[in-house]
């Protein structure tokens, strides 16, 4: 799930989706943060969170998702793998840190290092997002996570 008001985060979300869909043993869904519910999080085998960096933090919409779903998911998603991608105007560290902190509270398990695209999406960063999606899906398909 992701949020964006521009094209950069959408580009990375689509790349991650393409990577995940390359793993035939899994079913992948792409949802916007505002359209995601606690039931979606509970039903997922893994979760990939994507956001722009806004003022050194995650987007308000992604924070809203956590606010709306935290207590419904608390102690029900323990150990579920997650990963993060961030489109950053700065270094993305604030967004990553705070997403990780909330995910720690949910007892989610960090499966991969974050992908942070700084300033503009380079072909390498788009490929990194594709690989992130593929890695998360393959980890689920083959019981690694």
Region locations from a protein language model:
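Residues at alpha-helix caps and immediate loop-helix transition turns in enzyme cores, especially N-
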Residues: 12, 61, 95, 125-128
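Short helix-capping segments at alpha-helix termini
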Residues: 19-26, 74-76
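N-terminal beta1-alpha1 ligand-phosphate binding loop
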Residues: 1-23
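Glycine-rich phosphate/pyrophosphate-binding loop and the adjoining helix
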Residues: 23, 37, 109-145
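A short beta-strand-loop structural module common to alpha/beta enzyme folds
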Residues: 23-35
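Helix-loop-strand module that forms the ligand-binding subsite of alpha/beta enzymes
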Residues: 33-112
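Alpha-helical elements of Rossmann-like donor-binding domains used by nucleotide-donor carbohydrate transfer enzymes
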Residues: 15, 64, 98, 128-131, ...
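Short histidine/acidic/glycine/proline-rich micro-motifs that form metal-
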Residues: 3-7, 55, 86-91, 116-122
């Amino acid at each position: 799930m992701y949020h964006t008001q521009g094209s950069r985060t959408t580009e990375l979300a689509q790349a991650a989706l393409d990577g995940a869909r390359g793993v035939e043993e899994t079913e992948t869904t792409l949802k916007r943060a505002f359209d995601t519910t606690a039931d979606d999080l509970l039903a997922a085998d893994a979760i990939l969170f994507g956001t722009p960096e806004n003022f050194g933090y995650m987007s308000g919409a992604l924070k809203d998702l956590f606010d709306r779903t935290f207590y419904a998911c608390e102690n029900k998603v323990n150990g579920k793998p997650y990963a993060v991608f961030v489109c950053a105007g700065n270094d993305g560290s604030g967004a990553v840190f705070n997403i990780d902190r909330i995910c720690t509270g949910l007892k989610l398990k960090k499966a991969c290092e974050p992908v942070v695209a700084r300033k503009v999406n380079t072909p390498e960063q788009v490929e990194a997002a594709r690989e992130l999606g593929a890695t998360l899906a393959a980890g689920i398909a083959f019981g690694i996570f």
